[in-house]
Curated annotation (Swiss-Prot):
Pfam families named among the record's database cross-references: H2O2_YaaD
Family designation: Belongs to the UPF0246 family.
Name under which the protein is recorded: UPF0246 protein AM1_4276
GO cellular component term, pick one: cytosol
GO biological process, one term: response to hydroperoxide
Protein origin, superkingdom: Bacteria
InterPro entries with a match to the protein in the record: YaaA
Amino acid sequence: MLMIISPSKTQNFDPRPGIDYTVPAQAARTQRLVKQLRQYSPEDLGKLMKISPKLSDLNWQRYQDFQDSFTQNNAKQALLAFKGDVYNGIEVDTYTPEDFTFAQNHLRILSGLYGLLKPLDLIQPYRLEMGTKLQTDKGKTLYDFWGAQITDALNADLASDTTLVNLASGEYFKAVQPQQLNGKVLNIAFKENKNGTYKVIGIHAKRARGLMVNYAIQNRITAPKALQAFDEEGYGFEPSLSTETEWVFCRN
């Protein structure tokens, strides 16, 4: 069982020494994007990413400062650096070395800049959402740029894990080519009871994705069936709303 999640725009690069790290496998392609983004002015970067002048200046500087090599002086492990709704549900501050090892083997993070990340891959500060319409030599979007690269990387990991548990957003999962995967995809949805009807509420669903990742890591879950016991913060598996390819977890 391999889980995938989206990254986060919010990031924290305060040092966290003493934890193993790896280097992104697709770093060469990352540098191609960085080289291109360095050519943008802060104003053009703001238009491309639809962000404020303050964020435009911040991210322009990030790309100017981006280094060719990844070290603990200029980067941080992805699972530790990303913050935000999904990552608030992942209790990395309590993780043991064994927890990180399990995460490294069973979790992947999709990224517009880095492609496919392992939890302990070092990342430098950035902002580049997968849905950004960035023209490259591969096409008009980042989906064109990454092409089959992300799917190929997932297939390498799925050689021993036959189910891909999709806990990513639609924007990011679009970078995966499900028909080309060596395993089956299991989509997970989290819904809230609103006036007698179960609906997906974005902010709650994001946190729940993180909670499920955390649950799987801390309980060493390697078979999807065991995820049906997930009951964090009031959620429960709802068979009547679920199908073979999408499992729904509800909360009243």
